UniProtKB/Swiss-Prot annotation:
Membrane topology: Multi-pass membrane protein
Domain of life according to the entry: Bacteria
Metal-binding listed as a keyword: no
Family (UniProt): Belongs to the monovalent cation:proton antiporter 1 (CPA1) transporter (TC 2.A.36) family. NhaP2 subfamily.
Protein name: K(+)/H(+) antiporter NhaP2
Length: 580
């Protein structure tokens, strides 16, 4: 490869990445997932468009694995362990039982539609059987889903790859060797994948945490060290026949949930690297496909994709979530719809090509077609379906920016910047009149371009920008004081006519609103009653019905229900409320 060729590669690569970023601005306007747009850029530049011929499957496999490792590391860093209280076991059930059921149901129809053997059909089912972390993390961000739904989908997408990889590799080996039967030893291989991945992921995350917090480096080197450590865990786990995808996700999870040096610098750089990984991966996968090869299989492939979306995924979700009573029908319906396929199925479809199996090109084209349909149909409709099934909650008010104050190695102090909107009650109030959360301080106040020195007598005006020092747990209280109201089309009465304290006694609540206890303990706290009715770990937005009234979990403090909203039937006149 001479210098001119290398220069051309740099030029083409930079132009494609730049074009993907610029065209991605159409995503929100057209309601099309950004991943579809990037995939389309790759296809348009490929053999049937710009004429770039790319058919190097090992390179695509390399790029895909590297990109997914970075994306999963970033996803783990941003996942809160607190969300595991409501989603860990349901997500693991979906990642194992759900994938197996989806594989079986999809495989049966694939074998029939394309006149393949049963084991070849099951291989297609295994290739497209797992949801994709890149697609889920990208498309669910900012949708305002309740914690039970969002955490379940994110943990599922981060942990279901081992099952899909295991089934794919096993079925490829069986086809290559001419075997037709399954053996119990396969269960041991699966447990080994999960076990080694979990052990090395958690252990590697802990070692990386100690390393980052004990050495002094230039600020920009910590994110690079974290990425390098994540890739070491990914490759080492794969070398030991464990799940590298699971390991790198858990490594990020450990790092993201412990005090760590340069946290915001790490998260900021990983965000950019995750975006670059997604763009590069979907561009390469778009270049890899030959669009005119998809036309002959379009009709049966569309039928298979719709079968998987409308039948296989919903049935697998219902079966996998059967033991978990906290999930109501609307949540199961939404989880069924968000069976997003992305890069993982396309990368898994490269395995048969590299193994030289018959009909391997058909498997690849089918996987690509199903991913395209999934992103277009499911990804495009996510906001509408979430609103229809009522699985969203009003978002917490947020500062316009936040940055870390590295007072010491594991400092958790941050600076939050708020712009005061006209709708905030604090406009016209003096600073001394504000009920600031304990432990927070106003560090600076900007009015226009002028920096003011805030004092107790300073009166707040519309457009003022406040810099507040505090901790992450202060954000809800600060948000009520200073944040701009989010522009969302959610019902302003989402939580009800009144909001009550969770520790209010059931007897007092019943007497206040004229409700019958029907044998319930009058001393029982309202929060405990709601928890029992939910049937599992509650989340903000959970609703239960009691004597025609709707009770909604309004705020949580860890595992504890802090406040509950109550809504009365239309046309009724409620008694006095326990206003907050």
């Amino acid at each position: 490869m001479d210098a001119s060729t290398i220069n051309s590669l740099f030029l083409i690569g930079a132009l494609l990445v730049g074009a993907s970023i610029l065209v991605s601005s159409l995503s929100s306007r057209l309601g099309i997932p950004i991943l579809v747009i990037i995939l389309a850029v790759g296809m348009l530049a490929g053999v049937d468009g710009g004429g770039i011929i790319f058919n190097n499957y090992p390179t695509a496999y390399l790029v895909g694995n590297l990109a997914l490792a970075v994306i999963l590391l970033d996803g783990g860093l941003r996942t809160r362990v607190a969300s595991f209280r409501v989603a860990l076991w349901p997500a693991l059930s979906l990642a194992t039982v759900g994938v197996m059921i989806t594989t079986a149901l999809t495989g049966l129809i694939a074998a029939w539609l394309f006149n393949l053997s049963l084991i070849q059909g099951l291989l297609i089912g295994a290739i497209v059987g797992s949801t994709d972390a890149a697609a889920v993390f990208s498309l669910l961000g900012g949708k305002g889903l309740n914690e039970r739904v969002s955490a379940t989908l994110e943990i599922e997408s981060g942990s279901n790859d081992p099952m899909a990889v295991f089934l794919t590799v096993t079925l490829i080996d069986m086809i290559a060797s001419g075997e037709t039967g399954l053996h119990w030893s396969l269960l041991g291989h699966l447990l080994r994948e999960f076990g080694i991945g979990t052990l090395l992921g958690l252990g590697g995350g802990w070692l990386m945490l100690q390393l980052v917090n004990r050495i002094n480096l230039a600020g920009g080197l910590y994110p690079i060290l974290v990425v390098a450590g994540g890739l070491v865990m990914f490759s080492l786990t794969n070398a030991l026949h464990g799940s590298g995808f699971l390991a790198v996700y858990l490594c990020g999870l450990v790092l993201g949930n412990k005090p760590i040096r340069s946290r915001h610098g790490i998260l900021h750089m990983l965000d950019g690297m995750a975006w670059l990984a997604q763009i590069g991966m979907f561009l390469v996968l778009g270049l890899l496909v030959t669009p005119h090869d998809l036309l002959p299989i379009a009709l049966p492939a569309l039928g298979l994709a719709l079968w998987m979306i409308l039948v296989a995924r919903p049935l697998s979700v219902v079966a996998a979530l059967l033991p978990f009573k906290a999930f109501h029908g609307r949540e199961k319906g939404f989880i069924s719809w968000v069976g997003l396929r992305g890069a993982v199925p396309i990368i898994l479809a490269v395995f048969p090509l590299m193994a030289g199996l018959p009909d391997a090109q058909l498997f690849f084209n089918l996987a690509f077609f199903i991913v395209l349909v999934s992103l277009l149909v499911q990804g495009t409709s996510l906001p509408w379906v979430a609103k229809l099934l009522k699985v969203t909650v009003p978002p917490d008010p947020a500062p316009i920016s936040r940055s870390a104050l590295e007072v010491h190695i594991t400092s958790e102090w941050e600076m939050f910047v708020y712009r005061l909107g006209a709708e905030k009650w604090c406009i016209g109030a003096a600073l001394r009149e504000l009920k600031m959360p304990e432990g927070t301080r106003i560090a600076a106040l900007f009015r226009g371009e002028q920096l003011l020195h805030p004092s107790g007598s300073t009166v707040l005006e519309v457009g003022d920008m406040l810099c507040v020092i505090g901790h992450e747990h202060n954000l809800p209280a600060l948000g009520k004081l200073f944040s701009q109201a989010p522009q969302r089309g959610l019902d302003l009465r989402f939580f009800g006519d009144f909001v009550l304290e969770g520790d209010a006694e059931l007897g007092a609540v019943a007497a206040l609103y004229g409700l019958k206890l029907d044998g319930l303990d009058a001393k029982m706290p309202l929060a405990q009653f709601i928890r029992q009715k939910v049937g599992g770990a509650p989340v903000v937005g959970d609703q239960v019905e009691w004597h025609g009234t709707i009770w909604t979990v309004a705020t949580m403090d860890g595992n504890k229900i802090q406040k509950v909203g109550v809504r009365f039937p239309e046309g009724t006149r409620p008694g006095p409320g326990l206003f907050l």
